[in-house]
Amino acid sequence: MALTLKNDEQPQPADADITFNVEGRYLYGAPAAGNALQGQLYLRPARDAVAALPGYQFGDITEEGVKRSLGDVDIKLDANGKAQLTVENQWDQLHSPLNLILQASLLETGGRPVTRRATQAIWPAEALPGIRPLFGNKSIYDYRSDSYRDEPTVPENSLADFDIVYANSQGEKLAAEKLNVRLIRERRDYYWSFSDSEGWQSRYDAKDLQEDERSITVPAEGSTKVSFPVEWGSYRLEVQAGEKLSAACVFRRAMTGRIIPMVRAALCARIRSNSA
């Protein structure tokens, strides 16, 4: 059998319902009339939301509710082997770019299911700030997961540099005035806690300390560079345009068995400065 899932190629506004068009056929051309389609719907954040602007991160990384399951799908195709699946809006209060993902299987009695996946982009505003860290990656060991991963790292004795754009979903760089940029230090006071059920566990108390704030202007067809001195510790860079926030990925820094914080770039991006 063949299964086709179609959605709108253009990002949809955050207040819209989303429709997927489904078509199933047998390999000899006959429609898969009455066959069952089963699957799942997922909501995921789209940090790299603009393909035309590689390296720029969009969306509030601290925003809750952007990564969750929206339930199961169980429908039957009509006599023409077609169906239309409309997903009612459950994300209109979110401010980050999103992907609505449909993963579905077309079932056949006595045969193997055919599984396909479709992704619909959701864009929460006409334009959003985007942030690109201007420093390289380093392989970092995370003792909690006992694994290494590449993460952006601010070198010792260097500034944390970022490019900021104001762009729409097509990657057009627009002009923006009075974008508010804040550098927040994420203080973590670690301590050990013991319980009979969990034994000894490493925990921390969190406190955010604002270290810098400035207002910037971003030109049309361009970007604005911002630089901040950072000491040992964990940070995030926040960019606010009206009520919309933009965030980059989460960054951490570990070295020789101890955690070395970095700066968390974009609206909530962590980076850790290299103290070695």
What function would you assign to each model-found segment?
Residues M1-A276:
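A structural signal for beta-strand and strand-to-loop patches characteristic of beta-rich domains
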